[in-house]
UniProtKB/Swiss-Prot annotation:
Pfam families linked: RnaseA (PF00074)
Region ranges (Disordered): 1-24
Superkingdom of origin: Eukaryota
Paired cysteines (S-S): C26-C84, C40-C95, C58-C110, C65-C72
Species of the source: Capra hircus (Goat)
EC code: 4.6.1.18
Keyword Cell membrane applies: no
Official protein name in the record: Ribonuclease pancreatic
SUPFAM superfamilies the record matches: RNase A-like
Amino acid sequence: KESAAAKFERQHMDSSTSSASSSNYCNQMMKSRNLTQDRCKPVNTFVHESLADVQAVCSQKNVACKNGQTNCYQSYSTMSITDCRETGSSKYPNCAYKTTQAEKHIIVACEGNPYVPVHFDASV
């Protein structure tokens, strides 16, 4: 079974590009990362930074998660991210997404030993 840390990498890491390459980025990435297999995942964020930089956020600013848990951390610096949001015309299995590139602080939930990101909570 896929570990929570590996799932985070599959769902949220794209270190190979510095930003979304085109307006079609989300349509391609959501499909290739298996985020449209059983349904269209409504919202997803990809982070264009090194895995080490994103893992380091687990030792940065401790904040409360949206669900009230206390194991979330906010990055000290902004990061290059791409938000993928399902469009109104999207219908499974033909999931369609709007691609939005941004520079924001990320908030991730961390768990385990080593202490690594397992959930993308928000960007601010």
